[in-house]
């Protein structure tokens, strides 16, 4: 339904442009008219831009394991690609992108459901891409493109590892899992590498693409955006790299959880290992990614200042995690998303509208009932058309004088009208 809404909004905007005789892509967003906003809204729905972001956390976790990997890795990237082609350099999107990056990690920090947690990180990572393309310029667009590519690698690996854990244990709540590194060592190792990559650890691919985004924000003067995106990186570290690794894989093992690496299909193991290796290789050799970007930006992520800055931030975050580890433990509770802001009032709005429509329907039905009842009376008793007093009985119609006066007036009116016509004709002659 959400994609249908986005597709129809996009189609409506394109139809308006076509009716104006404009078929070039650049003309689709040339001016901020109705078509511009329809196209932007249509793409925003598919890219999970607020307030159209809650559907990801509701839909993705309920799909199949393989479906989640494909959708989490590719679906929202199509929306990002459209935004790069149509709305690159639109400053309005910068605010939405930064909000998505921060909001996603905040929700992931308190989320207990394994799959919903990664759904929120999809929103957060897409926020980085949208913020980068909104900054525009060669570095901004290349940063968004590189991060989209890298996101496919580490996000796909993370989702495969999560699916392996759920398939092996039959549980998807983090609070129900612990110490799986001994039982699923390959899965745990691949997850650790991918979780460090998504946080932006140096020497991994997430670091090289985030470096472009941060440089684009700094060079464009958006220092506030750079700061908030750095905070989002720290939140990613705490919610995935530390929280999930500790409570699911490397914490105290419990004997009541049955899981065995031998039960994991060989094809899935190979896919996880290849994904983890890809995160390492593209992180050690960033030119492999930079050369594929639209402008081929020559980035230099491994400067001493840049690497030191990330290490200091992550070290401080790790210390804070250890200090508040009891508060970081996931709890069994419902996570309220942004959709609750409009679901509650929308419920009462629909209820009030339904009552209003039902009232109009009942009144219209009653009025139609009275109307047809009167019509039925007139059809059975045509004399009611010339008098409001129906005869007392059909036997006394000839003796009752109730109809005499109206009939006499009609005859008199007929004679007067006839006389007027005759006089008019004689005068004309």
Regions found by a protein language model. Give the residues of each.
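Aromatic-capped, Gly/Pro-kinked transmembrane alpha-helices
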Residues: 291, 295-304, 326-429
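Hydrophobic alpha-helical membrane-embedded segments
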Residues: 155, 235-239, 316-333
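Hard-cation-handling environments
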Residues: 262-316
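Hydrophobic transmembrane alpha-helices and their helix-loop junctions in integral membrane proteins
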Residues: 1-263, 284
